[in-house]
Amino acid sequence: MSLITDISRQAAKAAHQLALLDTETKNKVLLDMAAALRAEKAFIIKENESDLAAARDNNLAAAMVDRLTLNDERVEAMAEGIEVIVSLDDPVGQLRDITERPNGIKIRKMRVPLGVVCMIYEARPNVTADAGALCFKSGNSVILRGGKEALKSSQAIASVMHSVLAKHNLPEALISVIPDPDRGLLMELMQQRDSIDLIIPRGGEGLINFVTENSTIPVIQHFKGVCHLYVDKDADLEVAINLLLNGKTQRTGVCNALEGLVVHQDIANEFLNLCAVVLRQEGVKINADSQAATYFDNATVLGDDEFGEEYLDLEIAIRVVPSFAAAVEHIAQFGSHHTEVICTKNAATAELFQRSVDASVVTVNASSRFSDGSQLGLGAEIGIATSKLHAYGPMGLESLTTEKYLVNGDGQIRE
């Protein structure tokens, strides 16, 4: 039996055990995991430093290095994320749609775990803790296949979580890390449909496409984040500037950072003059249509079909549009169904934007940076689904479950 087949089968076996574990016990285990991450913070950061040194030697892109980096604050955030998960309702076993048929048969729907979830990701060691905790609380085993860039960090975090599982006499196979980033093993992993129920890839466009095209297992896509801010003709321009700066400059290498700015013609002159000052101060590189480019020094002029880039850097694309409808059309053409933002004081326009724009998160007068499981009350997130089956948007506990029918009778037969 190959390594991958063995890991997958052990994960499936462990999932059956976890599915029957009560909420109180799961929460005790998770609290111990949070405490263990804090206690082993120095060990985790030391292992992460090895990954960072290799990343620098390999000239890894700045955005990827940022995602790879762990420090006291980020390890603490992982622990706090687990504690939030503890505070959330356990979806497993929840009942709804309780009905009784005319023949006396009673019908219910019950939430149940998916089974085995496989995470495929790049330089994101925090995914190890987030996915491990979310899958555990929702009753799923998880198989973690991180990129070579984060291998030591991921193994360190997993080893800490394994020590807690052992303390509670639970199998390590509940949280498995593929120890070798070899592409051939990844291909084999994506064929384990008898053991793995769902694959969630998190990373660049190339990784998402590779997994989607090669997996025989259902895939939920966490696609790139080409997020826009649309500044409406009725916008509060001070609010708009704050949304722009927070969305673009707070942390550039994340999928909920702004990559596009769409401005209504009626306020373009006043607003873009403000943008020219603040974006220059922040060192943001400007790509723009011919009209918007005139407000900026050294702007790169984009053609009509050259928008839609995920920069993951201090860089943004700007377009002036003649109407609300044109803004929605631009977002439909160049967005990635991740997060879209409108700044407006017009309630009717805001409501129409939220109904019209096809994105997993649509915000009004609030930063794109809130498109995150921790910010939306989900605790940690396992991903932000930009495809619509079977989840859409930040995925928390409920997204890691499905429903089955419970049918109870007292001897009825079908006539």
From Swiss-Prot:
GO biological process, one term: L-proline biosynthetic process
Cytoplasm in keyword set: yes
Top EC group: oxidoreductase
Entry EC no(s): 1.2.1.41
HAMAP family found in the cross-reference section: ProA
Pfam family, one: Aldedh
Keyword Calcium annotated: no
Annotated compartments: Cytoplasm
Family statement: Belongs to the gamma-glutamyl phosphate reductase family.
Catalytic activity: L-glutamate 5-semialdehyde + phosphate + NADP(+) = L-glutamyl 5-phosphate + NADPH + H(+)
Listed InterPro entries: Ald_DH/histidinol_DH (IPR016161), Ald_DH_C (IPR016163), Ald_DH_N (IPR016162), Aldehyde_DH_dom (IPR015590), G-glutamylP_reductase_CS (IPR020593), Glu-5-SA_DH (IPR012134), GPR_dom (IPR000965)
Protein name (record): Gamma-glutamyl phosphate reductase
GO cellular component: cytoplasm
